[in-house]
């Protein structure tokens, strides 16, 4: 169908293509559609199939041309992308540049469209990479094991009424609260009922955990809260608020005893409390190794990305912003548009920490995917089976069920890609030179502060 095409690369990893379609193709499709109309059209005064072509054209020419135009463009795009190696991004549709396109049956038809494609860049050979990574020495003591045991104790506790009826640290309380104006009138839009939280554990929006300690059921109290200028919620930062709070219920956790029976209740695999502690220790050691690998990979990607200029298309950035927004919206109340505004406020290359983090994550994803695509290794059927067996052992779901899931959902391709990604990551890790760092506690290590 395509008579000729001109392709031009634009900034932002965009492709501009000019497509020309022969007038003969246009005329053929137009005449075919005209004949189809003629055979089916019903017009008063004429039998079906006997309406003169001239009358059909006079009455329906614009509609016929519009139909042919749409078909020609759609078929041209299909043909173009079937042969063109620079594919469009799945979340960015091609855009036709011309407005009010019209067909002239006596001339070849030409139209221009623009689309965003995967950015082109080169990654260095792993064997040529010389990167040193300082990895801290992590020490694990009994308190780390005890903390995990305490978490399991809380998870397996029962919530019961607190007969003392007084709010204290760790009480589970249900409250009604509302903001008050200067005249102590309720600001209805801020009213919240049956809000449940654990005193001293939950980070409430208004941060009134400590203010309810000592209150009793059905007690009502008006408090004043002053918020620092860099308070975690911007809309409250630097403000003074009056709040009316009413306690509706006070409960507590009935914690099980930590003994051999407790361990058995956690899982049949544990016969004693020591069995449970040994399992937790092994899990902590595995977690430390995973975090160390993540630290090394972060160092690798940050070092490589600093040396690479990647012309990232806007739609790819938009998709990454939405991912970051979903993670961030749990901690703030801003809309997606407000979040995007923060990102774009000073352009792509500003020094804003949010922007730097999002672009850095995106560049890392692009680099690893490029390395996966270029790596010649093939994922075998045995590799697939081994991964499914591993998932079966970790999840408790049978191998047959996992295999059926991947096949039914057409996810085998993605599983292969994930397996290959892990193989490439192992190659990267093997290429890095580890330097012994300072000694840190397990708690400090897992909070990722040392990984910044």
Swiss-Prot record:
Any one Gene Ontology cellular component term annotated for this protein: cytoplasm
One Pfam family here: Trigger_C
Statement: the UniProt record of this protein carries the keyword Iron: no
Subcellular location: Cytoplasm
Catalyzed reactions per annotation: [protein]-peptidylproline (omega=180) = [protein]-peptidylproline (omega=0)
InterPro entries to which the protein is assigned, alphabetical: PPIase_dom_sf, Trig_fac, Trigger_fac_C, Trigger_fac_C_sf, Trigger_fac_ribosome-bd_bac, Trigger_fac_ribosome-bd_sf, Trigger_fact/SurA_dom_sf
Entry-linked Gene3D superfamilies: 3.10.50.40, Trigger factor ribosome-binding domain, Trigger factor, C-terminal domain
Protein name per UniProt: Trigger factor
UniProt source species: Borreliella afzelii (strain PKo)
């Amino acid at each position: 169908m395509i008579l000729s095409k001109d392709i031009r690369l634009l900034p932002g990893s965009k492709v501009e293509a000019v497509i020309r379609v022969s007038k003969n193709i246009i005329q053929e499709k137009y005449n075919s559609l005209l004949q189809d109309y003629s055979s089916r059209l019903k017009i008063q005064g004429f039998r079906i199939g006997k309406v003169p072509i001239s009358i059909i054209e006079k009455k329906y020419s614009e509609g016929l041309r519009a139909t042919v135009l749409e078909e020609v463009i759609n078929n041209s795009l299909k043909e173009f992308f079937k042969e063109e190696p620079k594919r469009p991004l799945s979340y960015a549709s091609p855009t036709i540049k011309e407005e009010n396109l019209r067909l002239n049956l006596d001339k070849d038809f030409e139209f221009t469209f623009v689309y965003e494609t995967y950015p082109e860049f080169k990654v260095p050979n792993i064997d040529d990479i010389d990167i040193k990574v300082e990895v801290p020495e992590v020490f694990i003591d009994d308190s780390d094991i005890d903390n995990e045991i305490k978490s399991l104790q809380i998870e397996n506790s029962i919530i019961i009424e607190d007969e003392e009826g007084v709010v204290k640290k760790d009480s589970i309380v249900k409250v009604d609260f509302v903001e008050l104006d200067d005249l102590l009138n309720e600001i209805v839009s801020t009213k919240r009922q049956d809000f449940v939280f654990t005193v001293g554990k939950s980070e409430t929006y208004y941060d009134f955990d400590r203010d309810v300690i000592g209150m009793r059921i059905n007690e009502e109290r008006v408090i004043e809260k002053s918020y620092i200028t860099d308070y975690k919620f911007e809309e409250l930062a630097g403000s003074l608020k009056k709040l009316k709070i009413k306690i509706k219920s006070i409960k507590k956790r009935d914690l099980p005893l930590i003994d051999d029976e407790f361990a058995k209740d956690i899982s049949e695999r544990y016969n004693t409390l020591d069995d449970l502690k040994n399992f937790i220790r092994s899990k902590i050691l595995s977690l430390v190794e995973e975090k160390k690998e993540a630290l090394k990979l972060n160092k690798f990607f940050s070092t490589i990305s600093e040396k690479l200029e990647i012309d990232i298309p806007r739609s790819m950035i938009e998709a990454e912003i939405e991912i970051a927004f979903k993670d961030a919206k749990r901690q703030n109340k801003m809309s997606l548009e407000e979040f995007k505004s923060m990102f774009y406020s000073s352009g792509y290359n500003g020094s804003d920490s949010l922007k730097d983090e999002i672009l850095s994550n995106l560049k890392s994803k692009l680099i690893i995917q490029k390395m996966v695509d270029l790596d010649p290794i093939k994922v075998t059927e045995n590799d697939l089976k081994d991964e499914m067996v591993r998932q079966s052992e970790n999840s408790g779901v049978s191998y047959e069920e996992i295999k059926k899931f991947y096949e039914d959902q057409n996810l085998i391709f993605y599983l292969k890609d994930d397996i290959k990604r892990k193989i490439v990551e192992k190659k990267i890790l093997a290429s890095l030179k580890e330097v012994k760092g300072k000694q840190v506690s397990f708690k400090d290590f897992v909070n990722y502060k040392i990984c910044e």
